[in-house]
Design a protein with these regions (language model features):
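Non-catalytic interaction regions
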Residues: 1-599
Length: 599
């Protein structure tokens, strides 16, 4: 225990409009009081109203559990494979499998552009059925056909009993499956006419103007090659042909087709024309794609949410949703360059002026605005803002990295609603707690509670390879000149293990969060090892006093005082300690590196 420890408790507050769970710190401070707490991240203060999730049908309800038996555990571990057995569409993207080597938590990461495609109802001669074709072709051997698409050399194979039960479940409750089964029956009749399935791309005229349409409106049969009633937004899946149809990120059937185990009832996803319950003041009438997914991905007590609570499949779905939102934004920029005043960036003369003398580089250039996170202009604008601060105040004095700790009590308490769930299953909760802690840490720095009075602060947020967020922060102190001093470094930075007899809490925290390695001969496979040596130059040398090398880099005090800890049964002393601020470490209890800098 530590009296100044940062702690917010569990997410014990709810939005008064949609019942999404929150921490008190996440309130809209300008509109809230202790008696009237306002949240608007989830539903924009009641303006976005969407249907609730329905309970999953059996046996899916019993299988999707984090605290279930052996069948449930095996299903949750292979849930992405099970979903791929029943998906109607292919996920055209490179999935980075190298990230999951080792013993760390599972992470779903993709590279490149996401494409969703659907083929014909009947496979080409000599080809095995796949995706939607499995609902039509050779259904007498359907289970074996589905199992044939699984890599036989994988770590584990889906259970045929579970696959059979899921086939029956989808046949009973999923309207999209029923449409494909109807097409199968038509195609198998002796006098079968040409049959196609229309995936409806526009939905309107559905009862409640605030509710999504019923899933029966997502698909229809076209008999005899008729194209009556087919709009430019619809996708027609023909019975034969080698052409693949791309499905738009805003097609209402997209997610139901790609994730039948998340949406077993075939519920429609985002589509254009979803109205606000209460129109906002900005003049818009329709819910945006981002607002739709933000609403759906908030947990509400007593309401099942497969989009958050399906383990590895939820990870894939959330990445898919984000990529869809990004694709829609990029599409808007592509077709609205005139609104962004981009005419000066187009044309051969402009290309030559920018040095694009190669003919392959000459053509139409599309500009991303500075408001688009990650764009070239976004990065340049923030870089020049920081350089402007440096021109006024000189180089920063302190550099600190604030890293998320997935074992924070707030995260653990947020997982209590789904017993057995782990932090790696809920990236949303991890990031929300991290931002609360980061806001508090930045406030501590700005108010002078960490490094004394400061003149300026700048920071950037990033994500580690495994997905945990962290923030790099640079600080300009008020009480220092342009040259750092030994006294200032020793006042705010320590690179030693505290004495366990005098400060047992400090010793325990440094031991847990601030010890590098072990690496070197004791662990040559450590991630920091490059060309046979540690890229971070550990272990450091013992030093009785802090000093600076000729280039101005600090050489922290690391006394040979006999204080040692063990990590992986390897003794580590002060030479392995990562520089830190002990008071900050005690308050936030995470990996928080602090360095002195002067250039």
């Amino acid at each position: 225990t530590y009296p100044k420890r940062s702690y917010y408790g569990g997410p014990d507050y709810t939005c008064q409009h949609c019942r999404a769970i929150f921490w008190y710190h996440e309130r809209v401070q300008s509109q809230s009081s202790r008696q009237h707490i306002v949240y608007n991240v989830c539903c924009r203060g009641g303006k976005v109203s969407l249907p609730k999730h329905r309970p999953s049908p059996p046996p899916l309800h019993e299988l999707v559990r984090f605290d279930g038996g052996s069948s449930s555990n095996q299903f949750m571990r292979l849930i992405r494979q099970y979903n791929s057995l029943f998906a109607f569409t292919s996920l055209g993207v490179h999935v980075d499998k190298s990230i999951n080597t080792g013993n760390g938590p599972y992470v779903f990461r993709i590279n490149g552009v996401v494409h969703h495609r659907i083929g014909s109802l009947i496979p080409e001669p000599g080809h095995r059925p796949e995706y939607a074709q499995l609902y039509i072709y050779d259904t007498a051997n359907e289970m074996q056909n589905r199992l044939n698409i699984v890599d036989p050399d994988g770590d584990a194979l889906p259970d045929p009993v579970i696959v059979s039960a899921l086939i029956k479940m989808l046949d009973d409750v999923n309207p999209l499956v029923k449409k494909f089964r109807m097409a199968r029956d038509r195609l198998h009749s002796p006098s079968a006419p040409e049959v196609a399935i229309k995936l409806i791309g526009t939905i309107d005229g559905h009862g409640d103007r605030y509710a999504l349409p019923s899933s029966t409106e997502l698909a229809g049969l076209l008999i005899g090659g008729s194209s009556a009633g087919v709009s430019s937004f619809d996708i027609v899946v023909q019975s034969h042909g080698s052409e693949f149809k791309h499905i738009s990120p805003i097609h209402p059937a997209l997610m139901a087709l790609q994730y039948p185990l998340l949406f077993p009832y075939g519920d429609p996803g985002y589509h254009t024309g979803i109205k606000f319950k209460q129109p906002p003041t900005d003049g818009r009438e329709n819910v945006s794609q981002q607002e739709f997914y933000v609403h759906r991905m908030h947990y509400r007590v007593g309401e099942p949410n497969p989009e958050l609570c399906s383990g590895r499949l939820s990870q894939q779905y959330q990445v898919n949703c984000y990529s869809s939102v990004e694709a829609s934004k990029l599409s808007f920029y592509f077709f609205n360059q005139d609104l962004l005043r981009c005419e000066t960036y187009q044309g051969i003369s402009d290309a030559m002026g920018r040095g694009a003398s190669n003919g392959r580089d000459v053509g139409i250039k599309k500009m991303l605005p500075a408001t688009h996170v990650g764009s070239k202009r976004y990065m340049q604008q923030n870089f020049h803002d920081c350089m402007a601060i440096c021109r006024v105040y000189g180089p920063p004095d302190k550099f600190t990295t604030f890293t998320c700790n997935p074992k924070w009590l707030e995260i653990i308490e947020a997982l209590r609603f789904e017993p057995g769930q782990r932090a790696s299953d809920r990236a949303d909760m991890v990031v929300r707690v991290f931002h609360m802690k980061l806001d508090e840490y930045l406030d501590d720095i700005k108010e002078g509670r960490v490094f004394g009075p400061v003149r300026a602060v700048a920071h950037t947020n990033e994500f580690q390879k495994r997905g945990l967020p962290h923030s790099h922060i640079i600080v300009w102190q008020s009480e220092t000149g342009h040259e750092p001093s030994v006294e200032d470094v020793d006042k705010y930075i320590s690179a030693e293990l505290p004495d366990p007899n005098i400060d047992p809490l400090g010793f325990s925290l440094v031991q847990e969060f601030m010890m590098h390695g072990p690496c070197g001969p004791a662990n040559p496979k450590s991630p920091c090892m490059k060309d046979g040596k540690c890229s971070k130059n550990y272990p450091k040398q013992f030093r009785s006093e802090t000093s600076f090398d000729p280039a101005g880099y600090p050489l922290y005090r690391r006394r040979n005082n006999g204080i040692v800890t063990c990590k992986n049964n390897i003794p580590l002393d002060n030479r392995w300690v990562v520089p830190h601020n002990l008071d900050v470490l005690k308050k936030y209890q995470a990996h928080i590196n602090v360095e002195a800098c002067n250039q």
